[in-house]
């Protein structure tokens, strides 16, 4: 689910996007590839009943809250099974082609397959940001990035 614009839960990437490639690489059937629009209705989302939701962008926490608190989303398998995840936000978008792209894959693998992967995302972010941007980050700052928060730990919207 895209959250770069405040378009709500029904805003996603479609076939041919980098996120389709990424989630197919991680072993998923990317639902966005089967949709005819990047803004499916509530009914289309319910009919698909995804096993996992992944939310990115500055509105990710707003969308995650909607999924977890509003009908009809609260009845979806991903929500009931607590498989609603975020994509970190940093100096560049993690889910777009950037210095953070490899970390995006490691982070998502940790979240989606915790029984198999335990990558040290905090260290990866700190090392990458230092190398590419010349900036030292604290664990707290990295935590904000990993949780989709602003540099002070507050909401991005």
Where are the regions that the model predicts?
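N-terminal ligand-binding lobe of clamshell/alpha-beta domains
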Residues: 1-157
